Amino acid sequence: MGYSFDRASKDVVKKLQGRDLRPVECLSDATKFRLFHILQETPRSGWETEDIPVGFTLLDLLEPNFPVPEPEVSAPKPFIHVQSTDLEANLNVADIARGGVGYVGYGGYNIEVQSTSIPNPKLEILQNRKLLDNLPTFMKFCRMERKNLYVVTEAYEVSKDTMLTGLSSVNLSVKGFFKQLFKVRGKAGRSEKYSIPIPKGSVLAYKKQQLVIENNTCVILPSATKKKMTFPGTPKYASASEPTEIYRTELQGLWINDIVPIGRIQEPAHLDFMCLQNEVYKQTEQLAELSKGVQEVVLSSILSMLYEGDRKVLYDLMNMLELNQLGHMDGPGGKILDELRKDSSNPCVDLKDLILYLLQALMVLSDSQLNLLAQSVEMGILPHQVELVKSILQPNFKYPWNIPFTLQPQLLAPLQGEGLAITYELLEECGLKMELNNPRSTWDLEAKMPLSALYGSLSFLQQLRKANSSSKPSLRPGYI
């Protein structure tokens, strides 16, 4: 159970209990969430929104020779967390074979964090300041696309170098039929050690406040609430191909055309599981319309990034697509960009949006889950995992309180041995307490978002795997 950077960030946010405090998910971007850095908010489909650093600070956009408020710095606060899991189970598979599986996980951190902040009274120095005449290109894009921008006004930074460490180990004993299946004797296993350095100055959590830009001046709102737009005087005119924003009202069973009022942001409609299920189904249906060759490139490229466990590559690719930049990129991400530049796919299907949908779902998950997803694809257990996750989400999605539930035996039956251990670890990383020899658990509201992202990721990968199953390609890195 490697204790990843994003998991530690979420843990620290929970312990700080600060209102509107958000975790930083990617270590490579941990220095891009410092004070005054500008963030672009982008929706993550059904699960949440993503704050993307644009690479500029507010101070870069203002006219020179102006006073800068002095930040307030708190004393360092220590945060220590150690988590260990030791699971064993004896499993029966249709009375054909009897075997055992064990999982041992350990992870934790010892971090000192201090906050740097600019309180609202000090922000008055920057209110109504004039912007540069020649603004960066990204500002023009955001104005045209009506993107909202935010500025970091409080950041929780690591006050000294530290290290995240962890260990995960799966041991599988097999007998009878499974001895031939796995071609081993006695015990098979997998063990991984984790060690992630976190340099001083890395931001674990932050607060943001919205920017409003009008008449070439900027105003920083007191909070990040969506009551105004960053560019309030810029209407987004509907095109012939996309005249209105169409959404489904499930309760009434009606299609409704809704034009978003100028100068305001529409609050997202209530999402129940049926909405999420329909959204994922629609996306995978479009994915299935792509050519087999395109799906092969996407699958092999995504799997290479998942196997490498390099969240930065996934994150960089997502940022490039979010900012509509199809420039050069090495490795598997570059192969996906090559396909996008070809633009030879089905004209009715937006390949970029489909890849973004998958990347946004993957970025909700932990580093451990990314690697476990790759293993799940290779083991061919995705359809069973999709149904299992669906069986958890469907009855519990709308409830904000803790509810005990029991996993259905018929859904667990195909997931035996290492497949069950991998699936349980995926669920545990979402925040559910799982035991291999116990199908009972408890619904936790905080698990809703990562479980939804896991459901979307599994469904996407299942469709890609299905398209590639006839040719049976190697799914290891370097396939294409």
Swiss-Prot record:
GO terms under biological process: intestinal epithelial cell development; programmed cell death
Region (Triggers pyroptosis): 1-226
GO cellular component: cytosol; plasma membrane
Keywords: Cell membrane, Cytoplasm, Lipoprotein, Membrane, Necrosis, Palmitate, Transmembrane, Transmembrane beta strand
InterPro entries registered for this protein in UniProt: Gasdermin, Gasdermin_pore, Gasdermin_PUB
Record flagged with keyword Lipoprotein: yes
PTM section of the record: Cleavage by CASP8 relieves autoinhibition by releasing the N-terminal moiety (Gasdermin-C2, N-terminal) that initiates pyroptosis. Palmitoylated.
Description of what induces expression: By type 2 cytokines in response to type-2 immunity following worm infection.
The keyword Iron appears for this protein: no
PANTHER family linked to this entry: GASDERMIN, GASDERMIN-C
Protein family according to the UniProt entry: Belongs to the gasdermin family.
Comment field on protein domains: Intramolecular interactions between N- and C-terminal domains are important for autoinhibition in the absence of activation signal. The intrinsic pyroptosis-inducing activity is carried by the N-terminal domain.
Protein name according to UniProt: Gasdermin-C2
Organism: Mus musculus
